[in-house]
């Protein structure tokens, strides 16, 4: 009942392009879908860890467990995530020992998962992990220190990976990193930076810039 008036229509112009919007987060602690009138049409009585609800293939999604937490120098991170359907049925449970934060995405429909994770070596939110979809095994962990070196590694949360996406045709990972003001592309097989979109004064004359096609933004 407390969610009945959670979404309020303040202004409406024309018919919405989307029948339903699925959301979860701070003020909406349970995954829920609402229509263009702001009416809740679907809700799951499972409260995930605050980073959200990640749709994957076959009308399923990944959610992070909020009770199984790993202490970090920043905030506790979940170490467990579930593959669920919209009826709340759990198909798989995955354990990521160094913790999960911010984003999870499929590499291919039904394939392995890319997870924003942590090095736990005095730093957090600085790694990308690949999780085997069938076995749950951690197939690979890429520490962003390998990509950017240590020039900016001057605080606990030096990268702060926010989002991930994967291009299966090119074997490339796209990422956004808040604390180094960058969107970038990495060759996932070779662990090489392909390009960056970032602030010019931050990245010019850096060693890796010679092997990356860089696009700079004028902060003005």
Where are these regions (language model features)?
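Histidine-/acidic-rich catalytic cores in large beta-rich domains
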Residues: 1-220
């Amino acid at each position: 009942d407390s969610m009945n008036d959670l979404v309020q229509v303040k202004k409406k112009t024309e018919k919405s392009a989307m029948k339903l919007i699925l959301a979860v987060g701070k003020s909406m602690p349970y995954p829920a879908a609402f229509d263009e009138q702001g009416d809740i049409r679907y809700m799951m009585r499972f409260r995930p860890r605050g980073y959200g609800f990640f749709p994957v293939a076959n009308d399923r999604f990944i959610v992070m467990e909020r009770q199984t937490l790993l202490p970090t120098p920043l905030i506790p991170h979940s170490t467990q995530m579930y593959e669920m359907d919209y009826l709340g049925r759990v198909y798989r449970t995955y354990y990521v020992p160094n913790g999960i934060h911010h984003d999870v995405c499929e590499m291919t429909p039904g394939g392995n998962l890319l997870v924003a994770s942590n090095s736990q070596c005095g730093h957090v939110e600085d790694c990308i992990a690949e999780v085997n979809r069938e076995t749950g095994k951690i197939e690979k962990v890429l520490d962003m220190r390998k990509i950017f070196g240590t020039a900016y590694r001057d605080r606990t949360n030096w990268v702060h990976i926010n989002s991930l996406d994967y291009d299966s045709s090119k074997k490339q990972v796209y990422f956004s990193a808040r604390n180094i003001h960058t969107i970038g592309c990495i060759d996932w097989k070779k662990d090489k930076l392909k390009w960056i979109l970032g602030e010019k004064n931050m990245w010019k004359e850096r060693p890796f810039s010679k092997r990356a096609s860089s696009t700079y933004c004028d902060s003005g």
